[in-house]
Structure formats: C-alpha cells, structure tokens
C-alpha cells in the first residue's frame, strides 16, 4: 500500500520548503514505504531528489534495518554510476533522503518501449559493472539489481539507486555466505532459491546478467505467470537467447546466467571479456575513495576552532530510533552513550570539563579534535567526550561512559558529571523539528 500521507514540513518553514533548505516540487515516484519528489536547493538552485520515508510504516513493516543500511551504505559510496546521497534530514514522523536527481528517469521505462541495440546495451552494462565492482571492492552487495533500480541522468548515463536490501560484509556468517532471502523474483539467483547461503557478489552478477538479457532482448529470460514454474526455470537455467544476439554476447550471457555460482563469471573476467571490452574505458574500473569513505565534504570538516562540523547524516545516525553504531562503532565497549546540544563553544566546554575532572583527581588525555578521554577511580570509570560543530551557534557533545561501582560507593557520573552536561544543554524551542535529539541515551 502506498503511503498516502502528505509531505510533512517543519512548522517554522513556509509550506513547500524543507528546513528552509529545499523547495519541494512535484511527485516523481512512489512505493510502499516512500515517495520521491523533485526538489531544489534554496541556496544553489541545484535540482535534487527528495525521498520521503514514513518512520511509522518502517517500524510497522519491520524495515528499520533496511533504512539504516541504506543510509550507511549510500553515505559511503562515491561513484559516477551510483546515485549520490547528499544528506539525511528528519522530523518526528518522516525521514528525508536528499539525493542526486536523475533527470532521465528509470532505465525500465526506456527498455519497456523496446529492446536496445548491442552498442547501447553494452554502454549501460559497462557502467553497471563498473559501479557493481566498485561496491563489491568495498564489501557492499546490492542484492536487488533490476532496471527499476537503475536510473538515468540528464546525459542518459546510468545511476544505481535503492540500496535498501543491500548487505555488508559484516552480515556474512561463519560459512562465508549470506543467508537472507532478498531480491525480486524474476532476478533472483538459483542459489538464493536453494536457501543454502550464497555469495553476495555472485548473486549481483546473476542479476547483472538478467539486466543485460533484458536490454538486448526486451523481455525477461525467466518469466511465467506461475511463480513456481518460473522458479524451476531459474533453478535449472532454462532460457533461450534471441536469435539476433551476436556470438560474443551469447557467450557472455551464458556465463553470466550460469546456475553454478562456482563457475559463474567474475567481475574481473567480465572486464576482460571480448564483447564487454569494446569501447570500454579502463579508468571506469579504477575508482577509489582515497581512504575517504566516511569523510565529510571539505567545507564541513573543521570549523575555525577545529571542532568537526556535523551534517544530518551524523545526527540521524546518532538518534536512538535509528542507531547505526552496529555498522560503524564500538559502542558496545561502553554502558551508556548520551548526546547533548549546547550553545557553549567547544573550547569553553573543554575548559570547564577540565576543571571538574581535575577537582575529582581524574586522568585526562586530550584528543586531536575537540574532545578528551577521562579515566579514574582505579580503573572503575572511563569516559570519552567528543564535541562536534552542529551549526554556527551550536555544538553536539557525545559522551560514551563505562562505570563499575567504586569502593567509595560514590556515583561520579550521576553526582557530578551528568549534572554538568545537563547544565549546558541548549533548550530548543518546542516547535523545532527533530533532526537532532537533545540529550539522548542509546
């Protein structure tokens, strides 16, 4: 069922604007849990796509994990054939993905009008394999590749979108395989149907084979009105390649749609395939992030004081309802994590905190950015404080604490330190939207 709720605009903004940063235009797409609108940056005029997701529908559908993965994964990816995620905003009931706008629409809409020639099929397949290989090299498997998830930009170049079903390498079980049944029926690999575990890279390659077949033929290789009959065809690899297909493409399709994942062609082999190599720019397979997977853009890295400026991705990643620490952090080492928003400067917070911990005879080690590690009570207390610039006027202070009962019986956190952080909290107006959580606990 499609989410029929209207777009929720923060109350302090004019109707049709999102946090005063984006003008929200016409609806360009919708699904069971999200709607996508065309938008425009009020600062630059740049066109963006705004994907609006209902938190309530996610929670009812048990899909919080999907949205967490999509935020985490898209934030890490920088490739010309992958839709760019600019930022994530949120209110109490909605999450807003602000993404690159693909003006050309879905590849599915183009191919549904008729099959492509081999040269055009090859061009899109080259862009697809470049992006998929890039994801795999970073331990990310899409698991739901299909023409509906492939968009086109204004130059009609391909862009992969919708990473909601994607898997990370940390989801692989001890047998080295993934075990979650994912994907769209006609694109599902035979080993997924067998429910014995599968290699995420291999099933993406199978889906790429289905996509290439569709581009060349104009129809699906495995299709039947009876789902079980279709699954049997997939499992046995029963398909016919159109007679107009060239011998080189025929050989490549046969290797892509090999029902045995052990002998199925690999990304490296695809790149060296004779049909694939025609007109291929080798630079497309050599995209690297230069160790910047989780870095912010240059204008967001450091303020004049040196406190790191947070973007909305950092904020929503830290909110209790959508905690991404399992994907990135080591929060399990601490028994409590709290966040406070304050109008104090980072320098002032550090100076005052140093005075308090000095009076308590605690050991302090300063971090490179604005923050510190505090230890004391003969190893029974440890705390890490990090201060990040939220806006020009506000900072967010994250406190990670581990504490065991001290011999004195005194609770250092409850009696002394937490009251200090509560004191400096910036009290937000009651009508403010909720892109941040003020002094939250996870």
Swiss-Prot record:
Subcellular localization, as worded in the UniProt entry: Cytoplasm; Nucleus
Outcome following mutation: residue 327 to A: No effect on binding to CBL2
Modified residues (Phosphoserine): 166
An example molecular function term from Gene Ontology annotations: protein serine/threonine kinase activity
Region described as PPI: 335-365
Effect of inactivating the gene: Increased sensitivity to glucose.
Coiled coil: none
Pfam families: NAF, Pkinase
Reactions mediated catalytically: L-seryl-[protein] + ATP = O-phospho-L-seryl-[protein] + ADP + H(+); L-threonyl-[protein] + ATP = O-phospho-L-threonyl-[protein] + ADP + H(+)
Annotated region (Activation loop), positions in chain: 162-191
Active site: 144 (proton acceptor)
Keyword field contains Nucleus: yes
Cellular component aspect of the GO annotation: cytoplasm; nucleus; plant-type vacuole; plasmodesma
Domain observations: The activation loop within the kinase domain is the target of phosphorylation/activation by upstream protein kinases. The PPI motif mediates the interaction with the ABI (abscisic acid-insensitive) phosphatases.
Subunit relationships: Interacts with CBL2. Interacts with CBL3. Interacts with CBL8. Interacts with CBL9. Interacts with KIN10 and KIN11.
Name of this protein: CBL-interacting serine/threonine-protein kinase 14
Organism field: Arabidopsis thaliana
Lineage, highest ranks first: Eukaryota, Viridiplantae, Streptophyta, Embryophyta, Tracheophyta
Gene symbol of the encoding locus: CIPK14
């Amino acid at each position: 069922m499609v989410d029929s709720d209207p777009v929720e605009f923060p109350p302090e903004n004019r109707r049709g604007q999102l946090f005063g940063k984006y003008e929200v235009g016409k609806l360009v797409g919708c699904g069971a849990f999200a709607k996508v609108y065309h938008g425009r940056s009020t600062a630059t005029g740049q066109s963006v796509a705004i994907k609006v997701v209902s938190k309530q529908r996610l929670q009812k559908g048990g899909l919080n994990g999907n949205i967490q993965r999509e935020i985490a994964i898209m934030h890490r990816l920088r490739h010309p054939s992958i839709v760019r995620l600019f930022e994530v905003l949120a209110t109490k009931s909605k999450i807003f993905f602000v993404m690159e706008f693909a003006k050309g629409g879905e590849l599915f809409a183009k191919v549904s009008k008729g099959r492509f020639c081999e040269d055009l099929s090859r061009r899109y397949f080259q862009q697809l394999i470049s992006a998929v290989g890039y994801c795999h090299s970073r331990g990310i498997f899409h698991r739901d590749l299909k023409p509906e998830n492939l968009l086109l930009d204004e130059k009609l170049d391909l862009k992969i979108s919708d990473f909601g079903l994607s898997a990370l390498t940390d989801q692989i079980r001890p047998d080295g395989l993934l075990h979650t049944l994912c994907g769209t029926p006609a694109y599902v690999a035979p080993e997924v149907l067998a429910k014995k575990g599968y290699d995420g890279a291999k099933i993406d390659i199978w889906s790429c084979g289905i996509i290439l077949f569709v581009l060349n033929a104009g129809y699906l290789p495995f299709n039947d009105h009876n789902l079980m009959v279709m699954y049997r065809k997939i499992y046995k690899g029963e398909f016919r390649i159109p007679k107009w297909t060239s011998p080189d493409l025929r050989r490549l399709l046969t290797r892509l749609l090999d029902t045995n994942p052990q002998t199925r062609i690999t990304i490296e082999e695809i790149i060296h395939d004779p049909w694939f190599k025609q007109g291929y720019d080798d630079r497309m397979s050599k995209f690297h992030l230069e160790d910047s997977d989780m870095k912010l853009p240059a204008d967001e890295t450091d303020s004049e004081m040196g406190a790191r400026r947070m973007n909305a991705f950092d904020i929503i990643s830290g909110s209790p309802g959508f905690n991404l620490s399992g994907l990135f952090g080591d929060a399990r080492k601490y028994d409590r994590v709290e966040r406070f928003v304050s109008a104090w400067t980072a320098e002032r917070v550090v100076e005052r905190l140093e005075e308090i911990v000095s009076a308590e005879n605690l050991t302090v080690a300063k971090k490179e950015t604005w923050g510190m590690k505090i230890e004391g009570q003969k190893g029974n207390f440890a705390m890490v404080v990090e201060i990040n610039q939220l806006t020009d006027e506000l900072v967010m202070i994250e406190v990670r604490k581990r504490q065991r009962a001290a011999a004195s019986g005194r609770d250092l956190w409850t009696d002394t330190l937490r009251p200090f952080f509560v004191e400096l909290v910036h009290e937000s107006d009651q009508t403010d939207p909720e892109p941040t959580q003020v002094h939250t606990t996870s």
